[in-house]
Design a protein with these regions (language model features):
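Cleavable N-terminal export/targeting peptides
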Residues: 1-25
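Transmembrane beta-barrel domains of Gram-negative outer membranes and organellar outer membranes
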Residues: 22-174, 181, 185-251, 255
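Flexible, glycine-rich linker and terminal segments associated
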Residues: 258-260
Length: 260
Protein backbone atom coordinates (compact mmCIF):
# COMPACT_ATOMS: atom_id res chain seq x y z
CA UNK A 1 0.00 0.00 0.00
CA UNK A 2 0.97 3.60 -0.42
CA UNK A 3 -1.02 6.71 0.34
CA UNK A 4 -1.51 7.71 -3.30
CA UNK A 5 -2.82 4.27 -4.29
CA UNK A 6 -6.24 5.55 -3.35
CA UNK A 7 -6.05 8.26 -5.98
CA UNK A 8 -5.26 5.54 -8.51
CA UNK A 9 -8.30 3.56 -7.41
CA UNK A 10 -10.45 6.61 -7.95
CA UNK A 11 -9.05 7.03 -11.43
CA UNK A 12 -9.80 3.40 -12.21
CA UNK A 13 -13.38 3.95 -11.21
CA UNK A 14 -13.72 7.03 -13.35
CA UNK A 15 -11.99 5.32 -16.23
CA UNK A 16 -14.58 2.54 -16.23
CA UNK A 17 -16.87 4.79 -18.25
CA UNK A 18 -14.34 5.32 -21.00
CA UNK A 19 -11.93 2.40 -21.32
CA UNK A 20 -9.64 2.40 -24.36
CA UNK A 21 -10.61 5.87 -25.52
CA UNK A 22 -8.57 6.98 -28.52
CA UNK A 23 -8.74 10.70 -27.75
CA UNK A 24 -5.94 11.87 -25.42
CA UNK A 25 -7.06 13.13 -22.01
CA UNK A 26 -5.38 15.40 -19.50
CA UNK A 27 -6.39 15.19 -15.83
CA UNK A 28 -5.66 17.46 -12.88
CA UNK A 29 -6.85 16.32 -9.46
CA UNK A 30 -6.40 16.65 -5.73
CA UNK A 31 -7.11 14.09 -3.00
CA UNK A 32 -6.80 15.12 0.67
CA UNK A 33 -6.70 12.08 2.98
CA UNK A 34 -6.41 11.31 6.69
CA UNK A 35 -4.98 8.14 8.28
CA UNK A 36 -4.72 7.08 11.90
CA UNK A 37 -3.00 4.05 13.43
CA UNK A 38 0.12 2.71 15.09
CA UNK A 39 1.74 1.26 11.93
CA UNK A 40 3.60 -1.27 14.09
CA UNK A 41 4.95 1.34 16.51
CA UNK A 42 4.11 2.07 20.15
CA UNK A 43 2.52 5.38 19.20
CA UNK A 44 -0.68 6.52 17.49
CA UNK A 45 0.15 8.38 14.29
CA UNK A 46 -2.16 10.92 12.66
CA UNK A 47 -1.27 11.54 9.03
CA UNK A 48 -2.78 14.14 6.71
CA UNK A 49 -1.77 13.49 3.10
CA UNK A 50 -2.77 15.81 0.27
CA UNK A 51 -1.95 14.39 -3.16
CA UNK A 52 -2.07 16.70 -6.18
CA UNK A 53 -1.74 14.77 -9.43
CA UNK A 54 -1.38 15.39 -13.15
CA UNK A 55 -2.12 12.72 -15.74
CA UNK A 56 -1.95 12.21 -19.49
CA UNK A 57 -3.75 9.24 -21.04
CA UNK A 58 -4.51 7.92 -24.50
CA UNK A 59 -5.65 4.51 -25.76
CA UNK A 60 -2.43 2.74 -24.72
CA UNK A 61 -0.33 5.05 -22.53
CA UNK A 62 -0.95 6.61 -19.12
CA UNK A 63 1.58 8.94 -17.51
CA UNK A 64 1.01 10.26 -14.01
CA UNK A 65 2.87 12.66 -11.74
CA UNK A 66 1.93 12.95 -8.05
CA UNK A 67 3.13 15.84 -5.88
CA UNK A 68 2.04 15.38 -2.24
CA UNK A 69 2.10 17.49 0.89
CA UNK A 70 1.79 15.78 4.26
CA UNK A 71 1.59 16.45 7.96
CA UNK A 72 2.15 13.85 10.68
CA UNK A 73 1.90 13.80 14.47
CA UNK A 74 2.93 11.03 16.86
CA UNK A 75 5.83 9.88 14.65
CA UNK A 76 8.47 8.15 16.83
CA UNK A 77 11.85 9.86 16.78
CA UNK A 78 14.14 8.04 14.36
CA UNK A 79 11.26 6.50 12.36
CA UNK A 80 10.38 7.53 8.80
CA UNK A 81 7.38 7.35 6.50
CA UNK A 82 8.04 5.28 3.40
CA UNK A 83 5.72 4.07 0.65
CA UNK A 84 2.57 4.22 2.76
CA UNK A 85 4.09 2.66 5.86
CA UNK A 86 6.58 3.42 8.64
CA UNK A 87 10.19 2.19 8.67
CA UNK A 88 13.12 2.44 11.09
CA UNK A 89 10.71 1.44 13.86
CA UNK A 90 12.11 0.55 17.26
CA UNK A 91 10.57 -1.99 19.62
CA UNK A 92 10.92 0.10 22.77
CA UNK A 93 8.77 3.18 23.48
CA UNK A 94 10.37 6.43 22.35
CA UNK A 95 9.61 10.11 22.14
CA UNK A 96 7.52 11.33 19.23
CA UNK A 97 7.38 14.47 17.13
CA UNK A 98 5.27 16.24 14.53
CA UNK A 99 6.38 17.32 11.06
CA UNK A 100 4.96 18.81 7.87
CA UNK A 101 6.29 19.35 4.37
CA UNK A 102 6.34 18.08 0.82
CA UNK A 103 6.28 14.33 0.42
CA UNK A 104 7.95 11.99 -2.04
CA UNK A 105 7.08 12.72 -5.67
CA UNK A 106 5.88 9.72 -7.69
CA UNK A 107 6.10 9.31 -11.48
CA UNK A 108 4.32 6.36 -13.11
CA UNK A 109 3.94 5.06 -16.66
CA UNK A 110 1.42 2.39 -17.70
CA UNK A 111 1.37 0.94 -21.22
CA UNK A 112 -1.38 -1.34 -22.54
CA UNK A 113 0.25 -4.01 -24.70
CA UNK A 114 -3.02 -5.94 -25.20
CA UNK A 115 -6.54 -4.54 -24.99
CA UNK A 116 -9.26 -6.47 -23.19
CA UNK A 117 -11.22 -8.77 -25.52
CA UNK A 118 -13.77 -11.38 -24.44
CA UNK A 119 -12.30 -13.41 -21.59
CA UNK A 120 -8.84 -11.98 -22.21
CA UNK A 121 -8.00 -9.09 -19.84
CA UNK A 122 -6.01 -6.08 -20.89
CA UNK A 123 -2.32 -6.57 -20.14
CA UNK A 124 -0.72 -3.42 -18.75
CA UNK A 125 2.94 -3.42 -17.67
CA UNK A 126 3.99 -0.39 -15.65
CA UNK A 127 6.96 1.31 -14.05
CA UNK A 128 7.12 3.81 -11.18
CA UNK A 129 9.75 5.99 -9.59
CA UNK A 130 9.50 7.43 -6.11
CA UNK A 131 11.78 10.42 -5.88
CA UNK A 132 13.11 10.87 -2.34
CA UNK A 133 12.02 14.50 -2.08
CA UNK A 134 10.47 14.28 1.40
CA UNK A 135 12.57 15.47 4.34
CA UNK A 136 14.54 12.57 5.81
CA UNK A 137 15.63 14.66 8.80
CA UNK A 138 11.97 15.19 9.79
CA UNK A 139 11.00 11.57 9.10
CA UNK A 140 8.70 12.45 6.18
CA UNK A 141 10.65 10.08 3.93
CA UNK A 142 13.86 8.10 3.67
CA UNK A 143 15.57 10.56 1.32
CA UNK A 144 16.16 7.72 -1.15
CA UNK A 145 14.57 6.91 -4.50
CA UNK A 146 12.49 3.74 -4.99
CA UNK A 147 11.96 2.01 -8.34
CA UNK A 148 9.05 -0.28 -9.15
CA UNK A 149 8.12 -2.50 -12.09
CA UNK A 150 4.91 -4.46 -12.38
CA UNK A 151 2.09 -5.95 -14.40
CA UNK A 152 -1.61 -5.16 -14.38
CA UNK A 153 -4.59 -7.16 -15.65
CA UNK A 154 -7.73 -5.12 -16.34
CA UNK A 155 -10.88 -6.97 -17.41
CA UNK A 156 -14.28 -5.87 -18.70
CA UNK A 157 -17.34 -7.99 -17.90
CA UNK A 158 -20.39 -6.76 -19.76
CA UNK A 159 -20.90 -3.02 -19.61
CA UNK A 160 -20.74 -2.50 -15.84
CA UNK A 161 -18.11 -4.68 -14.13
CA UNK A 162 -14.38 -3.95 -14.34
CA UNK A 163 -12.15 -6.36 -12.34
CA UNK A 164 -8.45 -5.62 -11.98
CA UNK A 165 -5.32 -7.10 -10.42
CA UNK A 166 -1.79 -5.73 -10.17
CA UNK A 167 1.50 -7.05 -8.86
CA UNK A 168 4.83 -5.25 -8.71
CA UNK A 169 8.34 -5.52 -7.35
CA UNK A 170 9.79 -2.44 -5.65
CA UNK A 171 13.51 -1.77 -5.36
CA UNK A 172 13.64 0.15 -2.09
CA UNK A 173 16.23 2.87 -1.53
CA UNK A 174 18.18 2.00 1.60
CA UNK A 175 19.54 4.77 3.86
CA UNK A 176 22.72 3.89 5.78
CA UNK A 177 22.00 1.74 8.82
CA UNK A 178 18.32 1.07 8.02
CA UNK A 179 18.65 -2.40 6.39
CA UNK A 180 15.47 -1.96 4.34
CA UNK A 181 14.51 -4.71 1.90
CA UNK A 182 12.95 -4.82 -1.56
CA UNK A 183 9.28 -5.81 -1.53
CA UNK A 184 6.38 -7.18 -3.56
CA UNK A 185 3.21 -5.09 -3.75
CA UNK A 186 -0.17 -6.26 -4.98
CA UNK A 187 -3.86 -5.43 -5.22
CA UNK A 188 -7.04 -7.01 -6.54
CA UNK A 189 -10.54 -5.64 -6.84
CA UNK A 190 -13.30 -4.49 -9.13
CA UNK A 191 -15.20 -1.38 -10.14
CA UNK A 192 -18.94 -1.43 -10.74
CA UNK A 193 -20.64 1.12 -12.98
CA UNK A 194 -23.95 1.84 -11.25
CA UNK A 195 -24.98 4.39 -13.87
CA UNK A 196 -23.33 7.07 -16.00
CA UNK A 197 -22.57 9.17 -12.90
CA UNK A 198 -21.81 6.68 -10.11
CA UNK A 199 -18.97 4.15 -9.89
CA UNK A 200 -18.25 1.91 -6.89
CA UNK A 201 -14.88 0.23 -6.32
CA UNK A 202 -13.73 -2.39 -3.81
CA UNK A 203 -10.14 -3.54 -3.44
CA UNK A 204 -7.72 -5.50 -1.29
CA UNK A 205 -4.29 -3.86 -1.25
CA UNK A 206 -1.14 -5.27 0.33
CA UNK A 207 2.64 -5.39 0.35
CA UNK A 208 5.58 -6.93 2.14
CA UNK A 209 7.23 -4.90 4.87
CA UNK A 210 10.23 -2.80 3.87
CA UNK A 211 11.60 -3.30 7.39
CA UNK A 212 12.42 -6.94 8.24
CA UNK A 213 10.64 -8.37 11.27
CA UNK A 214 7.48 -6.26 10.93
CA UNK A 215 4.07 -6.87 9.37
CA UNK A 216 3.51 -5.58 5.87
CA UNK A 217 0.52 -3.34 5.14
CA UNK A 218 -2.79 -4.96 4.17
CA UNK A 219 -5.88 -2.85 3.55
CA UNK A 220 -9.47 -3.16 2.43
CA UNK A 221 -10.55 -0.12 0.41
CA UNK A 222 -13.98 0.94 -0.81
CA UNK A 223 -14.39 3.98 -3.08
CA UNK A 224 -17.21 5.96 -4.68
CA UNK A 225 -16.86 8.18 -7.72
CA UNK A 226 -19.42 10.67 -8.91
CA UNK A 227 -18.79 11.69 -12.51
CA UNK A 228 -20.05 15.15 -13.40
CA UNK A 229 -18.98 14.81 -17.04
CA UNK A 230 -18.74 11.82 -19.37
CA UNK A 231 -14.99 12.41 -19.65
CA UNK A 232 -14.59 11.65 -15.94
CA UNK A 233 -14.48 15.01 -14.18
CA UNK A 234 -16.04 14.66 -10.77
CA UNK A 235 -15.67 13.82 -7.10
CA UNK A 236 -14.09 10.89 -5.27
CA UNK A 237 -14.58 9.44 -1.80
CA UNK A 238 -12.87 6.42 -0.28
CA UNK A 239 -12.58 4.62 3.05
CA UNK A 240 -9.69 2.40 4.11
CA UNK A 241 -9.73 -0.27 6.82
CA UNK A 242 -6.33 -1.59 7.87
CA UNK A 243 -6.13 -5.37 8.25
CA UNK A 244 -2.60 -5.72 9.61
CA UNK A 245 -0.33 -4.21 12.23
CA UNK A 246 1.57 -2.45 9.44
CA UNK A 247 -1.50 -0.54 8.23
CA UNK A 248 -3.48 2.40 9.58
CA UNK A 249 -6.47 1.56 11.74
CA UNK A 250 -8.51 3.55 9.25
CA UNK A 251 -8.19 6.12 6.50
CA UNK A 252 -10.58 8.39 4.64
CA UNK A 253 -10.20 10.70 1.67
CA UNK A 254 -12.34 12.99 -0.47
CA UNK A 255 -11.24 14.90 -3.54
CA UNK A 256 -11.95 15.73 -7.12
CA UNK A 257 -10.49 15.89 -10.59
CA UNK A 258 -11.00 17.73 -13.86
CA UNK A 259 -10.52 15.87 -17.15
CA UNK A 260 -9.79 17.89 -20.29
Amino acid sequence: MRWSHFVIISCLGVGATGIAQAAPQFTVGDMPSFFQGSFGTNSTLNIFYNDTYFQYQNSTLRLKLEVPYLSVSGLPNGASLSGGSVVSRKGAPTQTHSASGFGDVWLAAHYTVLQSSGLMPAIVPFAKIKFGTASASQGLGTGRNDYEIGMGLDETIGARIFPFAHIAYRFVGNPPGDNLQNIWTYNIGSSYLVNEHNVLTGMFDGAQSEQPGYSGPADLVVAWNYNVTRAGSGFQLYFDKGLSNGSPDFGIGIGGQVVF
